[in-house]
Amino acid sequence: GSTGNEGDGTLNGTPYIYIGGTATIGDKNLISNNTTLFGAESGSVFGIGNGRSGYSTIGSSDNSIIIIDDKATINNNVYGGGNYGATGVSSSSNTSYTNIIINDGFIEGSVYGGGNKNGSGSSSKTATVNITMNGGNVVGSIYGGSNEKGTIYGTVNVNINGGEVTNSVYGGGRGGYTNSSNSGTFVRDDINVVIGDSSLNTTPIINKSVYGGSAYGTVNDSSSGNNVSSSKTKVTVNKGIIVNVFGGGEGNNTYTPYVMGDIEVTINNGTITNVFGGNDLKGKPNGNITVTINDGTITNTYGGGNETSANTTNVYLNGGTVDKIFGGSNISGTVTTSNVTASGGTCTTLYGGNNAGGTTGVTNVLVDNGNITTVYGGGEATSVTESTNVTINNKVGTVFGGSNLSGNIPITNIVVNDANINDVYGGNNQGGKVENTNIDINGTLITNVYGGGLKAETTTTNVNLNYGLITNVYGGGNEAGAITTNVNLGGANIINVFGGSNTSGEVKTTNIKNLSVTTSDLSSAFTI
């Protein structure tokens, strides 16, 4: 077949490869010297034939089954497909499958659901790739797709139930677009990555990252572009010890990964350092992103990506323990709209915006339940370009309409309904500036309400005290000034009302409504 023509060396059947016992595949000297045979690398396992460059049917078979077991050692890579040949492309059936099962053993290289330089199925033959790891060790990474190039014309399912992966797990393939003859890797339909099985005693360990997308290629379509695919990328963690979880792809300075459809990340349990809804280093998913936390222990959760942008992000905290939640991205990237909803669980600090860099357009934060210490409508040290919208229906320690360390915001909106809160600030915390703040208090128990920020300036503040019991109300900020403050006392029960700021900060004009007197005295305080 290596010198044949299209259709030569085709197997109409299903190869079954079992490697167990103490078997060792590959001579390390040949591997280190990059020795090849008819273009195939030494020490690797291929689920079908080698094939020939430029011919997808040579070396093909209908399906592919590979099982790695016992104390077997694979000194290089495992491919569900061939070197050049594509699984199922010559099948008389309109479907094909690839099953890779790792029960135990040691794989020095990586595992690919597709082939080295080709994929599985065709535009008229739907392929399904299943990779299941129950134990053993993979020193490289696990890819649902192909290596250098190739399209999986169907769905990829990656299930890591146990064992240890030294590097990362990808729902898609590795290779990215280089030129027209090297277009990279594609998975046309859905991606389903599941880490851990709560019914089993095994706990998988992923020492680097889990990606729903590819390293550098495309998922949810057989071509890349700006359209939104109906296919989805789903990542579910039921248990496991993982450094990073990404709903999207990886990327680098050379390659941009594409996720063409919507992304869904669901954490049901596990110990995870960072959860990202989007991409890692490059690229923006075409669809929307949903991250749902039901349980587990997580250090940081981001609706967006690491150094990347996103369209609309949705983060739901239903349970578990999370140190910080960001509706936006981490280091950089623009997020159009972020939505964060807390219905349960525990979170120390919840942000509507980005963390260290980039911007968010509109942020929407809703706290209905859970143990939340501090809420920011904005980000940690980032700006919001349109508005922040914070609604509190539960007990919270401190609420800021704006950002923390820095960042500028044109409008912040806070609505508090029947909640118990220590401090409410319309503005930022330690830096940056908010132009206009709006606070509406509707039935609550609050110690302090500040129209402005804490050590952060505000232009205009608007505080509406409709209902509730409040100890102190300041039209301005805390150690921070404002140009104009507007306080409407409404029907709330208030002990002290100050038109200006607390401790320090200049306020040029104050307006307090629904008092028996009218004042413009910046230092005025009223006891009701």
Regions found by a protein language model. Give the residues of each.
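Surface-exposed loop/turn motifs in large extracellular/passenger domains
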Residues: G1-N77, N83-S110, N116-S141, N147-S168, ...
